[in-house]
Amino acid sequence: MDFSNFLCIEQELKLIALLVILFLYDTFCSKEWKKYFQNIAIVGFAIVIISEFPPYFTMYGEAFGGIHISSQLTFFMKSILNVATFLVFLQANKWLSSEKMLLRQGEFYVIMLISLLGMYFMISAENFVMLYIGMETASLPLACLVAFDKYQEKSAEAAVKYILTSALSSGVMLFGLSFLYGSLGSFYYSDIALNIVSSPLVKLGFVFFFGGLGFKLSLVPFHLWTADVYEGAPTSVTAYLSVVSKGAATFALIFVLYKVFGRIELIWNNILCWLLLATIVLGNLFAIRQQNIKRFFAFSSISQAGYILLGIIAGTAQGMTSTIFYTLVYLFSNLAAFGVIASVEYQTNGDTRIVSFNGLYRSNPGLAFVMMLAVFSLGGIPPFAGFFSKFFIFMAAAEQKQYILVFIALLNTVMSLYYYLLIVKAMFIEKRGEVVLEKIGIDNYNRISMVICTIGIFVIGFLSAIYEYIETISFGVLQK
């Protein structure tokens, strides 16, 4: 076997090496040494991330018979997922340090890294079989993570819902892939892109395939699992689902639509337009009436997926660039919010109702400030990064004369400000009554994560070099 194949999977090999080390440490170390596991996992993953820059030994190109591809773009996408996962690790520290979780830390980190490895394969796939294997490798560990807090009934219930809907989406995707293979005779992206025709079988195959991937993105009508799973899962797992899992699905969808189905753009463009409208509108409408903060962010996440579709619908290099940039900004904004949620939830013994945030500013002004920045960025209020990411998305769609979609998206952006400001109102204006929320002790790891997210929210929008870099490395992906 050619050794250059392994140079093309440098990121995967480093992650596998860390996985093996953590697994062996957790398996063979004594209980006295288990207390150091978190530090080893966090520092080890940080070393893996840092060691990838600059990528001296990474070789770009196809590997293992063309089923895997590495490029500057895939490297950057995986790096985005790495940063998001690292921030989730930091935020999970206090929860995993509790007495009931102390001996289960190893399981949490190993399972989450296995899921991340599957997402690597989804991004680098050049073959639909590879994409499916990556998706399943990512999904099965996620079901374990959703049920990780076995002492909570909602966690087990959420896991069952996630497993059932995930299995259904996998079956639907395989059904679609069977149509594509039957009509085109190949699973390779390049072969399908070369021979694809607008036949009824291809159209049907695409619809079923997209339905399976739409589950990962929580697009309407594939979103029914989202609110219950987000509410029932441990908060750190919810953060991972809303950012890392959604990001991997977004990146995989970009490659499939632009590289494989670029020649039948008119077909998938029409489908995505209707899904976009339903996703943005229903996500916003249901978010308004939520009383639980995690369900609130579940529907917020659904509506945010609609903006991602708007960038993809543009079908241009600018549209793809703005979609990737939007995902990067969404990472910092959403994880900043979940860092605050995790802290408040721990202090209030698992209370995730929005009213539990009443008067947060009076006792914990720092946390209230971070949450305010997060929801302002998610709502697209200038001068935060979320404003610039939405602006680029709207510009990309407007350049392709998608004026109606842009107008509806703008209206829904204004609508979203109402429910985002409800959180700000609860923290800064509402009073808690007789029960006063004590000052929350934030551990150093979570504090670091929120500082990183805050810097990202403030700075990324003004760094045009990041957008330009994404535009540069995205060159050549479009196949029409």
From Swiss-Prot:
One of its GO terms (biological process) is ATP synthesis coupled electron transport. It catalyses: a quinone + NADH + 5 H(+)(in) = a quinol + NAD(+) + 4 H(+)(out). It holds the Pfam family Proton_antipo_M. GO terms for molecular function: NADH dehydrogenase (ubiquinone) activity; NADH:ubiquinone reductase (non-electrogenic) activity; quinone binding. It is found in: Cell inner membrane. Its EC number is 7.1.1.-. Keywords: Cell inner membrane, Cell membrane, Membrane, NAD, Quinone, Translocase, Transmembrane, Transmembrane helix, Transport. InterPro entries: NADH-Q_OxRdtase_suN/2 (IPR010096), ND/Mrp_TM (IPR001750). One of its GO terms (cellular component) is plasma membrane. It is a multi-pass membrane protein. The keyword Transmembrane helix applies. Its main location: membrane. The chain crosses the membrane at residues 5-25, 40-60, 69-89, 110-130, 162-182, 204-224, 237-257, 266-286, 296-316, 324-344, 368-388, 404-424, 450-470. Belongs to the complex I subunit 2 family. PANTHER family: NADH DEHYDROGENASE (PTHR22773). HAMAP family: NDH1_NuoN_1. NDH-1 shuttles electrons from NADH, via FMN and iron-sulfur (Fe-S) centers, to quinones in the respiratory chain. The immediate electron acceptor for the enzyme in this species is believed to be a menaquinone. Couples the redox reaction to proton translocation (for every two electrons transferred, four hydrogen ions are translocated across the cytoplasmic membrane), and thus conserves the redox energy in a proton gradient. NDH-1 is composed of 14 different subunits. Subunits NuoA, H, J, K, L, M, N constitute the membrane sector of the complex. This is NADH-quinone oxidoreductase subunit N. It comes from Azobacteroides pseudotrichonymphae genomovar. CFP2. The lineage of its organism: Bacteria, Pseudomonadati, Bacteroidota, Bacteroidia, Bacteroidales.
